[in-house]
């Protein structure tokens, strides 16, 4: 059972009693804080489609990435309190507005409050949009409720994960989590250019870290049938927050860096 009272929702397993006002790594309370619920057109085309993804951006995060592009939401507790009933109403409003899916963005640390809002089952796919740093036990509570998993796989390099996200165990945690996601939803199902089921793994190429990216792609190629899991290789790294003072992360990636990783992706036929 997912519970705030001895919180082990994420791999940090802080064990704090959030119902008593204690705060763990994510610094979140025992109720939802959400920053935004709106149609979102800037996800992968298979997710946003023509009509937008019904995205709910939850405050807080189980990671603390030095380069986070949503730091106000993820690290500065921006957002307003939302009940499970209000969250369900937001889902229904977004569906009425024509969304292609309901997109839960960084939801893990609020799951005890989110799960009631997912019942009864929604008439559109549910997307679980996360940083990849997930507990397998927590993910198992989502089986049958989530249709599409949209995790990051940020790091194959543990030292890099420690330096940039305070998570030296990220590679093994994300590996186990993504395997569980795939076990639940299986290979990609695409209907009318819209994803209805499956896993898309996102990877952001970081400056000066080509080997980290190649390691991520190697892991994907080694663990899934070709084209069963989709890969979204992202180039939009921008120095933000602490990264501005942390070379080489104080610069954008070069076209040559991105092309080197993209060529390897094609070589692996991902």
Question: What does each model-found stretch correspond to?
Answer:
Residues 80, 84, 167, 171, ...:
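Flexible, glycine- and charge-enriched loops at secondary-structure boundaries
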Residues 66-70, 76-81, 114-117, 138-141:
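Short, conserved acidic/polar surface loops in the N-terminal third of protein domains
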Residues 4, 8, 20, 59, ...:
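Electropositive phosphate-/nucleotide-binding environments in soluble metabolic enzymes
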Residues 1-62, 66, 70-75:
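N-terminal [4Fe-4S]-dependent radical SAM core
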Residues 39, 50-53, 58, 64-77, ...:
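Long, low-complexity, intrinsically disordered polar/charged segments
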Residues 72-101, 264:
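Conserved alpha-helical substructure of the radical SAM core
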Residues 89-247:
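Conserved AdoMet/S-adenosylmethionine-binding subsite of the radical SAM
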Residues 1-9, 13, 230, 251-270:
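Iron-sulfur (Fe-S) cluster-binding modules
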């Amino acid at each position: 059972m997912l519970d705030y009272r001895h919180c082990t929702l994420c791999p940090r397993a802080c064990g704090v009693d959030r119902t008593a006002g204690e705060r763990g790594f994510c610094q979140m309370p025992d109720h939802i804080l959400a920053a935004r619920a709106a149609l979102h057109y800037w996800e992968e085309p298979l997710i946003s489609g023509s009509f937008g993804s019904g995205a709910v951006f939850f405050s807080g995060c189980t990671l603390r990435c030095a380069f986070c592009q949503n730091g106000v939401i993820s690290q500065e507790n921006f957002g307003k309190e939302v009940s499970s009933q209000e969250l369900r109403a937001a889902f229904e409003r977004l569906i009425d507005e024509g969304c292609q899916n309901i997109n839960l963005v960084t939801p893990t640390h609020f799951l005890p409050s989110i799960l009631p809002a997912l019942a009864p089952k929604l008439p559109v796919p549910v997307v679980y949009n996360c940083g990849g740093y997930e507990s397998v036990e927590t993910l198992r509570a989502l089986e049958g409720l989530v249709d599409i998993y949209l995790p990051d796989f940020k790091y194959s390099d543990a030292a890099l994960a420690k330096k940039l996200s305070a998570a030296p165990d990220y590679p093994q945690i994300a590996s186990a989590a993504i395997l569980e996601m795939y076990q639940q939803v299986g290979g990609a199902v695409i209907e009318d250019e819209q994803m209805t089921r499956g896993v898309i793994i996102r990877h952001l190429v970081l400056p000066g870290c080509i080997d980290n990216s190649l390691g991520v792609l190697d892991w994907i190629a080694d663990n899934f049938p070709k084209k069963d899991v989709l890969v979204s290789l992202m180039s939009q790294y921008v120095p933000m927050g602490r990264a501005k003072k942390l070379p080489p992360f104080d610069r954008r990636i070069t076209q040559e860096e991105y092309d080197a990783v993209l060529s390897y992706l094609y070589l692996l036929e991902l």
